[in-house]
Amino acid sequence: MLPLLKSLRPRQWSKNVVIFAGLAFSGAATDQGLLVSALTAFAAFCLASSAVYIVNDIFDRERDRLHPIKRHRPIASGTMSVKAGILFAIILVAASLFLSSLVGTAVWAIGGYLVLQALYTPWLKHVVLLDVFSIAAGFSLRVLGGAWAIEAPLSPWLVACTVQLALFLALCKRRAEAANLSPEQLSGDTTTGQRPILAEYAGQGTDMMVGIMAAATLVTFTLYTLLPASVLSAGIPDLESRAGEPGMVFTLPFVFYGVLRYLHLVYSKGEGERPERIATMDPPMIIAGLGFVAVAGGVIYF
C-alpha cells in the first residue's frame, strides 16, 4: 500500500488548488452546492494527475534508476511492478472521468488534460519550450475545469494570469534544474538520470525568459485589478459584476512580494526545482499567500 501512496504523489495535489479560482473570484464560494461541485472537480483532477505520475514513472523508470533521488520511486526501485502501475493508472483514470462527469462539462477539461499528458510524457517534455508550454496548458485546463464544474463564466484575464504564472514557475523550475547540472550532464551525458533537454535551459536565454514572464504576470494582474469591469469582462455580460473590484488593488503588494521572493529563492538560494515545496514550506511565501487570500476574500465577499 505504501508504494502505491508514494506513486500517487499527494504532495503534488496542491497544484490542483487553482481549480477553485473560478469559484473564489465569482463570489460564489459560500454556495454549498457549487462548493461541492468544485471539490468534486478537484478530486477528479487529483486522481487524473496521480495516474499521469504513475505512467510517467513507468516511461522514465530506466532513467530514474540512475538518478540519486528518483531511483527511490516505487516503480524505479522495483517495490511496485509495471503491471501494477498500469492497472492502478487505468483505475485512477476511470474514477477521474466518472467523477468529472458528475459536474457538468468538467469532464472535457479532464479529457483534454489526459490527452495533453499522453503527448507530454513520451514526447513534449523532451522538446525545449514545448515542455513548459505544456505545463502552462495543464494549469489552464485545471482553471477551466473548475469554472465549468460550477457553470460559471471565467474572465479571460484570469486565464491569462494563470498561463503566465504557470510559464514563470515552469521556467524557474527548468532554470533551477539546469543550474544543478554537472559539466558531464551539460555535455549531454545520459548516464546520470537527468533528461538531456535540461541542458538547453542552462544559458542566459532562460534567465531572460524568466524575467519576461515575471513582468508579464505582474503587469497582467495589475491591469486585472485596476481596469474597469466593462473592460475586464471582455464582452461577457455575466462577468461585469465580478471583475474590476476597486479593493483588489490592495492585493498587489502580496502578489509583487510573492513573485520577487520566488525569484530570490531561485537565483540566490538555488531553489525552484519543487515549486510546491516553496509554496507550502517557505514562511514568507506562506504569509504572502495568506495575506492575498485575506484581502481578496474581504474585497469579494464583504
Question: Model-found features: residue ranges?
Answer:
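Topogenic membrane-insertion module of multi-pass membrane proteins
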Residues: 1-65, 78-91
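Hydrophobic alpha-helical transmembrane segments
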Residues: 24-28, 95-102, 120-123, 145-150, ...
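Generic alpha-helical transmembrane segments of integral inner-membrane proteins
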Residues: 17-21, 39, 43-50, 87-98, ...
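Acidic (Asp/Glu-rich) catalytic motifs at the cytosolic membrane interface
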Residues: 48-76, 124, 130, 172-179, ...
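C-terminal membrane-associated helical module and adjoining short loops/tails
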Residues: 2-5, 122, 140-302
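Short, amphipathic, aromatic/basic-enriched membrane-interface segments that mark the entry/exit
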Residues: 4-11, 73-85, 101-106, 124-132, ...
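Short, aromatic-rich membrane-interface segments at the entry and exit
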Residues: 33-37, 105-110, 128-132, 153-159
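Multi-pass membrane catalytic core of lipid/isoprenoid biosynthesis enzymes
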Residues: 61, 66-111, 156-167, 207-219, ...
